[in-house]
A protein has these predicted regions:
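Short, hydrophobic/aromatic beta-strand segments
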Residues: 122-132, 263-266, 302-306
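Solvent-exposed, conformationally flexible loop/turn segments
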Residues: 245-248, 283-289, 324-326
Length: 367
């Protein structure tokens, strides 16, 4: 239901609330995210930039590049909040005449799901080059004020088990998790700047070039290509999606709570993602044994681990059943060459996750 109307921003605000989530949504974007019953009443989303904003870059049949901001369109339609058997749902749709973007949220028990559908409404084919999801957490450090209530985000970009975690600077209170669902992956990210349109150019330059926010991409062919030309080394191969007239492509994500950031990995594993713990870490001396633990709900036969381009999987040396209905698989390996290495994890039906390591010279040499 509509709880209020923001006169300054000229937007309707909708509430999705239950025993776990206290969420406000407007124009398809989360502008307030709190956990119900949180004694700290921590705000996780930036009230202006929010979570879940969609930016799409596509090419038409004439190779013209168009950038589409789904949440900033004047012509958008919100269905409002609909009550379902086990929860609440919300949907909005916007279009530029060539593509139509539908953004829906469904709150059910302890999970808030977000689904994005991109439809080619034109009569000719188009190519989706970049699809980005804006994630701006509530972070505003002011001189003389405590930094504790501010929220910081940490991201792992590596296939189907990519994720973002958000928690207070002081580590207190619950941890918010953002993760892909179904067949959706995250393959790229960047940090961008936002400027207050009410500020003049001089004021913008004097405010440290605007407020930063993170964009997460299921794929980003154009942006990755631009980054590579500027010297970036791309770990994940990017791609584009061709949509003929009337065709649709979908992306699914979930917001989850963990009681503490130390419990976030367990919560992700329960949701079907691969949670990895590596000892001694991801930067290790050449030839040093790495102990890797993978936790998930997948069976041992459904999880295969490969090192770099090897076609032979690394053998699992031990398994453990956990009380949370998850399983832990343990592996040992080492890197004999210096530099970057990739551990590829294939699981389920064509799902994949990536871990990135860097092998340094032995400690004796570095010392």
């Amino acid at each position: 239901m509509i709880r209020e109307y923001d006169m300054k921003e000229k937007r309707k605000i909708y509430y999705l609330t239950n025993a776990e989530f206290d969420v406000q949504i407007s124009k398809g974007m989360i502008i307030s995210m709190k956990r119900t019953g949180d004694s700290y009443q921590t705000q996780y989303a930036d009230e202006k930039l929010g979570f879940g904003g969609i930016c799409i870059l596509y090419e038409d049949v004439h190779k013209n590049t168009v950038e589409f901001f789904a949440n900033d369109q004047e012509t958008y339609q919100e269905s409002g909040v609909v009550r379902r058997d086990n929860g609440l749902s919300y949907q909005t749709e916007s279009s530029d005449g060539t593509i139509s973007v539908s953004i829906s949220y469904e709150l059910e028990y302890d999970k808030l799901s977000q689904k994005i559908q991109v439809i080619n409404t034109s009569e000719k084919e188009i190519t989706l080059c970049d699809v980005g999801i804006r994630q701006a957490c509530h972070t505003e450090f002011k001189w003389g004020e405590s930094a504790s209530p501010n929220v910081i985000g940490h991201y792992h970009i590596g296939g189907n088990s990519s994720h973002g975690t958000y928690y207070r600077v002081d580590g207190e209170g619950p941890c918010l998790i953002f993760a892909p669902q179904e067949d959706t992956q995250l393959l790229y990210y960047d940090v961008q700047k936002w400027f207050n349109p009410e500020s003049n150019e001089r004021e913008q330059k004097e405010t440290e070039e605007g407020k930063g926010f993170t964009m997460l991409y299921p794929f980003a062919a154009k942006r990755a290509e631009r980054a590579a030309k500027n010297g970036a080394r791309l770990r994940a191969q990017q791609h584009t999606v061709l949509l003929k007239s009337g065709e649709t492509v979908s992306f699914s994500f979930a917001y989850l709570w963990a009681d503490h950031f130390l419990r976030a990995g367990k919560r992700m594993a329960q949701e079907g993602l691969i949670h990895a713990v590596s000892i001694p870490g991801y930067t290790i001396p050449q030839g040093t044994n790495v102990q890797l633990c993978l936790e998930s709900t997948w069976g041992q036969g459904e999880v295969k681990v490969f090192c770099d381009e090897s076609k032979k999987p690394i053998s699992c040396i031990r398994t453990k059943e956990c009380e949370s209905d998850t399983k832990q698989y343990f592996y040992e390996f080492s890197f004999e060459t210096l530099g970057e290495h990739t551990i590829s994890i294939r699981y389920g039906k064509q799902k994949q996750a990536y871990l990135y390591y860097f092998a340094t010279q032995p400690v004796e040499t570095l010392w």
